[in-house]
Amino acid sequence: MKFYIVLLALAAFAMAEADPNLEARAGCSQKGKYCNGGTFLCCPGQGSCKGNQIAKKKYSASEAPSTEGVQRLLLVTGYALECLGCLFSQTPGYSGSVLPLLNSH
């Protein structure tokens, strides 16, 4: 059930982040591609131009995370939980539950 709630929240976030003015973004370049000095333009929300390429965008604490940022956070969280499970499984006397570990002291 939690999985479906997270999936629904991510879908809603991705839909909210989509720019409704796609025509204005048609000539925009992707990160690392040419921008103002080249054939493409830097676009709002993508970062700034540094030299002839789009630089990485700096985020502020008041700004909502991007879909890419949320995906990275979920990936790191998944790895952390997987690692935590590995740590418990290596504990002598571990039976698959944390309760015996808590009651042993």
Curated annotation (Swiss-Prot):
Disulfide bonds join 35-86, 42-83, 43-49. The lineage of its organism: Eukaryota, Fungi, Dikarya, Ascomycota, Pezizomycotina. It is found in: Secreted; Secreted, Cell wall. It comes from the Eukaryota. Disruption phenotype: Affects hydrophobicity only when HfbC, HfbE and HfbF are also deleted. Disruption of all 7 hydrophobins leads to altered germination kinetics, decreased survival under exposure to extreme cold stress and increased mycotoxins patulin and citrinin production. Residues 1-18 form the signal peptide. Keywords: Cell wall, Disulfide bond, Secreted, Signal. Aerial growth, conidiation, and dispersal of filamentous fungi in the environment rely upon a capability of their secreting small amphipathic proteins called hydrophobins (HPBs) with low sequence identity. Class I can self-assemble into an outermost layer of rodlet bundles on aerial cell surfaces, conferring cellular hydrophobicity that supports fungal growth, development and dispersal; whereas Class II form highly ordered films at water-air interfaces through intermolecular interactions but contribute nothing to the rodlet structure. It comes from Penicillium expansum (Blue mold rot fungus). This is Unclassified hydrophobin D. Its main location: secreted. The keyword Protein transport does not apply. The gene is HfbD.
